[in-house]
Amino acid sequence: MKKIHLICNSHLDPVWMWDWEEGLGESISTFHQAELFCREFDFVFNHNESVLYEFIEEHDPDLFERIKEQVKAGKWHIMGGWYLQPDCNMPSGEAFVRQIGLGRKYFAEKFDARPATAVNFDSFGHSVGLVQILKKCGYDSYICCRPNPEMMDLPRDFWWVGKDGSRVKVTRTTDENLYCTAFGNAKNEIIRMASSYADGEVGVALWGVGNHGGLPSRKDLEEVTALIASSDDPLVHSTPEQYFAELEPKTEFTKSMQPCLIGCYTAMQSIKQKHIELENKLFTTEKLCAYAALNGLYTKNEDAFRKAEKALAALEFHDIYSGTCASDGEKSSLRKADYALELLQTEFNKAFFALCGKHQKAEIGEFPVFIFNSQPYAREAVCETEFLVPTPIISDTEQYTVSVYQNGKKIPSQCIKELSNINYDRRKRIAYRCELPALGEARVDIRLETEPKKFLAPTTGDEIVFSDSIKTIRISRKTGLMESCIVNGKEMLSGGAFRPVMYEDNADPWGWNMEHIGENPVDFVLCDGSTGPFEKLTNVNVIEDGDILTEVESFFWQGSSFVRISYKMYKDMPYTDIKADVFWNEQQKALKLKMPAAFDGQFIGQIPFGSDTFEKDGKEITAHRFVGFRDGENVLTLYNNCTYGFSAEGNDLYATLLRGAAYCAHPIGDRILIDPDRFIPAIEQGKHSFAFRLSYDPLEKLENNAQEFVNTPFSLNFFPHGNGNAAENVLSVENPAISLSAFYQEENGYVLRLVNNNAEPNETDLTLCGQSHRLSFGKYEVKTCFYDGSSLIEKEYWV
C-alpha cells in the first residue's frame, strides 16, 4: 500500500505574459474562489508568496480576514513562506536571505505561520548555495519541479547537502505537468501521478489549475472527493510539511540542480544589471547608515529600506530575473528598481553628509574629497572624483593640474577625461591612489596649479606595452586584443584575450533544449573607421597615460554591431579593468568575450555564499561576481558586475554578454517560435556596457575582491564645516578570507552577517565599537550575529 499526499495549489505568476496589475488582480479572483471552496469542500488549499497576500490585504480587506479564519481552521495552509518564487540561481546569498525574510516576517505577523518547507515549484534550477540558507532560515525541507527529468537525472527524493554540510530533504517532482493539473481533469492526473509510486512509498501529487491562478474546478473537487473515498491506497488532502514528515530520503545530492534553461542566465541583461546595482546599493547603504548610527549621527528611515527590499525581491521573480517575461514586465520592474535606488540614494546622502560634515574646514585653496569604504578592513584603492574649479581656463596653451594630499602627504594622482564635454578647463576628473580605513570615510585634499597644456603623444608601433612592479601587459595594435599578461613572471594568457565573438542563436529566451549558447562563432574584427559609432577614430589608441593608469581603447565590428573594448591598466596594482561598450543590433545572435588562459586550471565561479567548480566542456553555467581558472592557491580571476552566463572549453574562458532573443518566446511543440511576417522586437537591442576586472589573486580573497570591484568607493568633493571631530571606526574584520555580507540597524540593535569563503574551518578577530570578538567558522559557514550595544550574539535562525 502507498500513501499519496494531495497538495492542492494554484500557481500564480504575478508577472509573465502579463504585467503586475493583471497578476495581482488574478490573485483576488483566485483567492476569493479558494476561500469559498474551503467553506464548501473538505480539502486543504496551499498557497505561498506574501506579495499576493499583501495585495489582498490592501485591496480586499474583507477577503483577507476570511482567509485568516480559514488558516486558523486548518483549511488554508500558508505554504513556502517567501515573498515570491524567485530565480534560484542568480540572487546573491544575502539577497536570498532578504527574499525569505520579507515573507517570513509577514506571515508570522499576519497569520502566526512559520512554514518548515520551502517551495519554489517554477524556478529554473536551484543553486547548492541555497541549502545553508534554507537550513539557517528555519527550513528542513524543499520542494521543486525543475530541472525537468529530461534536463537532469536526479532521484525524486534526496537529502540535499550544502557546501557547509547543512542538509535538507528535497523532492524534485517528476510529473509531466509539474505543479498543476488541467482544468476538469484533476482526477485522471492524480491517478497517473499516484501510479508512479510503488507499494510502501510515500508520494506527493501537486494538483490544481495554475500558471494564471484558477484553482481546481468544482468538478475537480467533486471527482477528487469521490476518488479519495473509493481508493484502495490512502489519498489525503495534505500540506508540504505533513508530506515531508513521513518521507525519509535514501540518497544524498551535493551539487546544484543545474543546468536548467541556460538562456535565462543571460537574457534581458537590463534586469540582471539593475538587480546587481540595486542589491549592492542596498547593502552598501545599510552599512553606511549603521556606521553613522553607531556614531550617533543618523537613524535610517526604516520604511525606505523596506520598500527597497521589496523592490529587490520583486526583481528576483523567476520570470523577471530570468528575462522570460513580456516587455511590459521588463519596463515596470525597472521602474520599481529605479524608485528603490532613489530611496536608497536619499538615505545614503543623509548619512554621508552627516559623517563628512564633522570634519575640519578646508584651508584656503583646498578642495576636500571624502571617500566611503564599505569593506570592514583598511585597504589601498584607486579612486576617481570629479570637482568644479571656480574659474575656467579658456586657452590652447595652459591648463590646470592638481596635487592630492592625504594626512598632509602627497599621494599619486592623475587628471583624466571628465564626463562632461564643454571645451574649456573647469571640470576636473582625477584618479588617485589613497588609503581607506575599515568601514569608514577617508579624506584627501586637492590643490590646484597651472601648467603648460599637455597632449598625449600619438600611438605608434605594432604593440602597446605596459609594465610596472607587478605585471607586464601587451596589447596588439594589429588585433586590438590583450596578447600577453605576465604577473610576477608568470604568463596568464595565451594571446588574443577579450575578443568579442558573435554566434548564431535563436529567439527563445529560456534556451529550451540547449546546453551551449550559440553556434558557428564569428570573430569581431577591428573597425576601419569608415562607418558606425567609431567613424574616423583610430581603432587602437592610448587615451590616458599618467602616474595612476594607462588606458587603451580598441574598436571592433561584426554584422550590424560594434564593440568598444577599453583596457585600464593601473600602475603597481595587481588588476586591470576591462570594459565592453556594445552597440548591439542583432536578432537571434549571441555575443561573448573570449579569454584564453596560458595554463590548465580548474574552472571555478561564485555561487550564493560560496564558490563551486564547473566542467570545462563548453556548456553554459551560471556564476555571480567572479569566475576563473584555479592555479594552486591562486586564481586567474575575471570579476564582473554585469552578467551571469559563462562557459569554459579547454583553457578558454567565455563570458556571455547578450542574446538577441524575442520577448517571452516560449516553444510550443514543433510550432514556429515567432511570427515570421511582422517585426518582432528583440530584447537586447541598443547600447550596453559590461565591466570586468582581470587579476591573479589568492583563492581566499576572491569574495572580498569581488565586493571591492562591484562596490566602487563613493567619493565626493564637499566642504565641511565641522571642528575636526570625525566619526570613530566601529567595525573591522581581520581575516581576508572572511567577508561582511550585511551590517544593518534594526529594532534594538544591529545585524552582522559574515561568510567564511574557504573550504576549511577558519577564525577571525572582529572589532565592534572597541570590543574584540573571536569568531570561529566551519567550512563555507555563514554566521548571523546580533549586536545589542554591549554584546555580540550568534543567531541560530537568521529570520
Identify what each model region corresponds to.
Residues 10-26, 48-57, 81-97, 113-125, ...:
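The substrate-binding groove and active-site-proximal loops of carbohydrate-active enzymes
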Residues 111-154, 214-223:
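Catalytic domains of cell-wall/extracellular-matrix polysaccharide-remodeling enzymes
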Residues 96-129, 133-136, 190-206:
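CE4/NodB-like, metal-dependent polysaccharide N-deacetylase domain
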Residues 1-94, 98-99, 107-109, 136-139, ...:
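N-terminal catalytic cores of secreted or lumenal carbohydrate-active enzymes
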Residues 130-133, 154-156, 183, 190-191, ...:
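C-terminal (or distal) subdomains of carbohydrate-active enzymes
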Residues 11-17, 22, 167-357, 370-376, ...:
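Catalytic grooves of carbohydrate-active enzymes
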Residues 88-109, 174-196, 525, 550:
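Alpha-helical scaffold elements lining the catalytic groove of polysaccharide deacetylases
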Residues 29-33, 58-73, 99-102, 146-164, ...:
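Alpha-helical scaffolding within the catalytic cores
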